[in-house]
Design a protein with these regions (language model features):
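Beta-strand/loop-rich accessory regions of lumenal/periplasmic or secreted enzymes
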Residues: 87-89, 184, 281, 675-681, ...
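Beta-strand-rich binding/interaction modules
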Residues: 148, 231-264, 622-655, 672-673, ...
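An acidic-aromatic loop/edge-strand motif
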Residues: 87, 92, 99-108, 157, ...
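Surface beta-strand/loop "capping" patches
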Residues: 213-243, 599-638, 726-741, 855
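Intrinsically disordered, low-complexity Pro/Gly/Ser/Thr-rich segments with frequent PxxP/GP/PP motifs
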Residues: 269-275, 648-681
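Accessory beta-strand-rich segments of carbohydrate-active enzymes
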Residues: 3-14, 37-38, 52-56, 86-92, ...
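Extended acidic/polar, glycine-enriched regions
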Residues: 172-175, 239-311, 680-723, 730
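Extended substrate-binding grooves/exosites of carbohydrate-active enzymes
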Residues: 1-39, 88, 96, 151, ...
């Protein structure tokens, strides 16, 4: 082996690295653009770009000293830096959530440990004003050795943290050669078991910094308001190169470039007072510009003046109670993997701002350093998480008989093992030291799912002593094994993952001395989450509940190109023949891999809208509104638009922009005048929409921030079109009858309907020589399981809800009052099992072909709750024009419809498909008055006296159940029209609590009625 085995040595976490410091880019002058153009600094030299690269399947296969000067790399390929080598045909992709991808035998990793040799040359000219040169790696997975001009520079690990080396003595004027050996695994990999694809390489920028011989090495800015929250106090602690202080000046400028504070310094501290300070918060992210100037160097940074603290279990920022409406964010892209460019992170943040997200947890490692400058600038509260996760230790083979044994077993291998204390604390320090000057960072998190013990007690102690101005977080602190008493004195928050609402209420009492935070909740996997509104209500009704972070931001996937038909192909766990893997559990984001929003993100946006309507009095013409923002007055942020919808159609609209009317302080409520014309009859609603008042960096003027639909009473509160369609059809006809043991055919000159006496449903329906059914009608209790059904799915399949058949017993038919009435007793059952439910189905056929169905069902209570109950019709695919009046335009369910409103919408069955990468139930619409599907000749409408749910699709639920990827789906050749009494809610039980009882389809007695009305066009 050509390198020492530091990669399996707890005593050598780093070799020759510089002490940790805050991130900044020095220059010879003030920098105006700290994020987008850091290369403008004359002291910054980017080494990212094309490198020579060779892949080895094992570090033991590296025989030649490729790092020597003049080594022939002509046989090497070219690879971009930053990147991950799995995306360039080397090794293989692997997604695993908890389980380690190698045997659990720390500090050892497999001999078959892949590695990559990187080499590049660059030109260098020594700067007399800045002769010292430092080499920075912002992210390398998992560990690396580095050489300059053939000489060993050093070694480092901790994939998502910066490693800096002094290379002054290794550089020469002219051509220089840098060589890096990156290993896939090292002893640090036991602490990097995050839920993600496992990728390797130099995945963040590499650069050189030229610096003076003497000067600032590090600085720590503490900028907080005074007790009155009117003025600001800025304190800067400076660490000097070689410990030798220099003279310099510190200047603070406001956003108009006015000098607001200045101080000369020649020691270790700087103090500045800011009168009438603008305080930083996520709604008004005001930043001052700090300029630190010493001989030969200028450091430019941004400063936000703010204070975060907890008191009596309540979280405060600048003395104001705040709530986190947050998300967990991984670095993930289907093409570039972990390598996330500035443009990519800006796109993420733009979409977040568009959807009312105000907080980010950097799950589960620090982001690239410039990300935090964007968080400061755009306004996000950040939980900055250290690169610590050892979840795989939970999976080691053991026999547990109690919670205490489980926790003890998980704790003992790493979290409560002193051997890992140095590594755990090191990872925390590297996170905290680098990001300590970022005002957006309000909470330090020690890591994720590592269990608890002495290692994290030490990390928390160091963090709190080093930075008492911020709060500390670590969810796994709750995994304790009695009777050992753990030290929680340095932990500021009580944190949970995926608690139920009832658990939260209980724990708010039990642990009420600390703010309660959900570091993960409402698992956004596939079609979901479905219970956001319930969590919102609890978050904003409990002072000690400071909010939460949705799991998670984006679907993780690998771009595999396109099919022959042009369909996009994304791969997830198991698609690369890897072991172990966790399937599509990585497809759990609010956005698709390409950042197209899921309907779950649309739901989040409107649940967390900045303003809510709390009441409307149509008689008085008054609207009561509440400002849910924490700092901003409504008049400065938004304007109000409104529409009156009657039977789904807009009848009136207007705007309120008067600042006097919209004068509403944060957290306050008021009533304003808003008179509308209310019809005598019809289903009427007032839709209030909030729009961005003034453009920001990411949101344009008039951008929609959220909306509210308020029902307005009329005399009948009924949709008049539905009411008209529900009238008894006029006219009479002479019915023709044809009946045998199996079928009953009822016909007139206008239609011919064939009824299957074995099923109690129609086999064929022909209206005006137009077939209405491609296949026999069905009673339907199955849905293609959503990802959030992943647990109950097994229960449903054990009950064989996916294999049901309908059996009719006795059928009675008669012609009476100008119509035909058919009554059949029936049951639904599955092979080898007893009846699931039984009841009576009644059909009434009118002379114009209109058909009413009344279904009564009694479910055997021994069976589990149902996925759905309703009718399934297979219409010819020519019935492709959809019109409906109900909750739209996006999919909606009983617990997931805040992004929808009642209107009349036009679409097609193909457009209704919400194209989840793993196919599942999608595209349903809740609370509908009617739904019509039309061909160029005829239309079939479903309408009811009560509202119903429906779904129109080109795919069957069987196809959606069976196929593993969306690109595998094949249209069935029909338009599948599901008309449902109800569907079960969506919830978030893929990694969370069971679906709330009120959203379950748990009734054992069901009565459902709907009318099917065909018409010629």
């Amino acid at each position: 082996m050509i390198v020492p085995k530091y990669f399996e040595d707890f005593d050598h976490l780093h070799v020759n690295t510089m002490p940790n410091r805050a991130y900044y880019i020095p220059a010879s002058r003030r920098m105006e653009d700290l994020v987008e153009n850091r290369e403008a600094s004359d002291r910054f030299f980017l080494l990212s770009g094309d490198w020579k690269f060779r892949y080895f399947t094992s570090v033991y296969d590296v025989k030649e000293e490729f790092f020597t000067e003049g080594y022939d790399t002509s046989a090497f390929e070219t690879i971009p830096v930053p990147s991950v080598w799995q995306n360039y045909g080397h090794d293989h992709h692997q997604y695993t959530n908890v389980r380690y991808p190698f045997p659990v035998d720390p500090p050892y990793v497999p001999y078959e440990n892949p590695c990559g040799a990187y080499v590049r040359t660059f030109e260098w000219k020594k700067q007399e004003e800045a002769p010292r040169v430092f080499l920075n790696f912002e992210g390398v997975d998992s560990c690396f050795y580095v050489w300059m001009n053939g000489s060993f520079v050093g070694y480092s690990q901790v994939s998502h943290s910066t490693s800096e080396f002094d290379v002054t003595d290794f550089l020469k004027d002219g051509t220089n050669t840098i060589a890096v050996l990156v290993l896939k695994w090292c002893d640090g990999s036991y602490l990097e078991d995050q839920d993600k694809f496992r990728m390797s390489g130099i995945f963040r920028d590499v650069y050189l910094l030229a610096r003076p011989e003497k000067g600032i090495r590090d600085y720590f800015v503490k900028a907080a308001p005074d007790a009155s929250y009117q003025n600001g106090e800025v304190s800067i602690a400076i660490t000097w190169n070689d410990g030798e202080p220099q003279e310099g000046t510190a200047k603070l400028f406001d956003t108009e470039n006015h000098l607001v504070a200045e101080a000369a310094f020649g020691g270790d501290t700087v103090q500045m007072h800011v009168k009438d300070a603008h305080l930083w918060n996520a709604e008004e992210p005001y930043l001052y510009t700090l300029v630190l100037e010493t001989a030969g160097e200028v450091i430019t940074d941004h400063v936000g003046i703010r204070e975060i603290h907890a008191k009596d279990g309540v979280l405060y920022l600048n003395g104001v109670k705040i709530k986190f409406h947050g998300t967990n964010r991984h670095d993930s892209d289907p093409v570039t993997g972990f390598a996330i460019s500035l443009a990519q992170i800006k796109k993420d943040l733009k979409v977040m701002k568009e959807h009312n997200i105000n907080a980010i947890r950097t799950s589960h490692y620090p982001n690239a350093p410039y990300c935090y400058q964007l968080y400061d600038r755009l306004g996000f509260y950040v939980i900055d998480e250290a690169d610590n996760e050892s979840h795989g230790t939970e999976e080691i083979y053991a026999n547990y008989t109690s919670w205490e044994e489980y926790a003890k077993n998980w704790n003992k291998l790493i979290a409560n093992n002193p051997v890992f204390t140095e590594a755990t604390v090191d990872r925390t320090q590297r996170c905290v030291e680098r990001d300590k000057n970022r005002p957006s960072v309000v909470i330090w998190s020690m890591g994720n799912e590592c269990a608890y013990g002495c290692t994290f007690e030490a990390a928390l102690k160091w963090t709190k002593e080093f930075d008492p101005t911020r709060l500390t977080h670590y969810e796994s602190a709750r995994y304790v094994d009695d009777p050992k008493k753990y030290d929680y004195s340095n932990l500021d928050l009580y944190s949970r993952m995926y608690p139920s609402l009832e658990e939260i209420k209980k724990e708010l009492v039990e642990y009420g001395d600390k703010p309660y935070i959900m570091c993960e909740y409402c698992h956004a996997m596939g079609n979901g989450p479905g219970d956001l509104e319930d969590y919102f209500e609890l978050i904003h009704s409990e002072e000690k509940m400071c909010g939460g972070f949705i799991w998670e931001w984006c679907d993780h996937a690998i771009d595999m190109g396109k099919t022959i038909e042009g369909k996009k192909m994304y791969a997830y766990g198991g698609d690369h023949n890897e072991y172990p893997h966790d399937g599509n559990f990585c497809m759990d984001g609010l956005v698709y891999p390409d950042r197209t929003p899921h309907t779950g993100l649309m739901e989040f946006k409107n649940v967390y809208r900045p303003v809510r309507v709390t009441g409307y009095d149509a008689e008085k013409g008054t609207l009561t509104i509440k400002n849910y923002m924490n700092f901003v007055n409504l008049k400065d942020y938004a304007v109000l638009g409104y529409e009156v919808l009657v039977d789904g159609e807009v009848t009136e609209s207007g705007k309120i922009t008067d600042e006097a009317l919209l004068e509403l302080a944060a957290g306050c409520e008021k009533t304003i005048p808003l008179a509308i014309s209310v019809p005598e009859q019809g289903k009427c609603a007032l839709k209030v929409t909030w729009y961005q008042k003034q453009a920001t960096e990411v949101l344009p003027e008039q951008f929609e921030l959220g909306f509210e639909e308020v029902p307005v009473k009329t005399k009948d509160n009924q949709n008049q079109k539905a009411k008209e369609m529900m009238k008894r059809p006029e006219g009479t006809a002479s019915f023709g009858w044809k009946e045998d043991d199996h079928y009953l055919t009822v016909s007139t000159e206008q239609f011919s309907y064939t009824y299957n006496k074995f099923t109690g449903l129609f086999e064929e329906m022909c209206y005006a020589n137009q077939n209405l059914l491609d296949r026999p009608m069905e009673l339907n209790i199955w849905r293609a399981p959503t990802d959030n059904d992943r647990n109950i799915k097994n229960t449903w399949m054990r009950a064989q809800y996916d294999r049901t058949v309908t059996r009719a017993y006795e059928t009675k038919a008669k012609e009476e009052n100008g119509c035909v009435e058919i009554e059949t007793s029936y049951s639904i059952s599955s092979p080898a099992l007893q009846r699931i439910l039984a009841g009576v189905i009644k059909w009434t056929i009118y002379s114009d072909g209109t058909t009413d169905v009344h279904v009564e069902a009694k479910k055997d209570p021994v069976f589990p709750v149902l996925p759905r109950f309703g009718l399934r019709l297979f219409l010819p695919e020519s019935f492709a024009e959809l019109t409906y009046c109900g909750l739209g335009p996006v999919e909606s369910y009983v617990d997931k419809h805040q992004a929808s409103y009642h209107g009349v919408f036009h679409s097609t069955p193909a457009e209704q498909q919400e194209d989840y990468i793993r196919p599942q139930e999608n595209g349903s619409h809740y609370d509908c008055d009617y739904a019509s599907l039309a061909s160029d000749r005829a239309v079939l409408t479903a309408v009811g006296e009560k509202t119903f749910s429906f779904q129109a699709s080109v795919y069957t639920q069987e196809e959606l159940t069976e196929k593993a990827h969306n690109y595998e789906l094949k249209p069935c050749g029909s338009t599948v029209f599901c008309i449902d009494y109800r569907q079960a809610g969506i919830g978030s039980a893929s990694c969370g609590p069971m679906l709330l009882e009120k959203y379950q389809l748990k009734e054992n007695e069901i009565k459902f009625a709907v009318r099917l009305k065909p018409e010629l066009l």
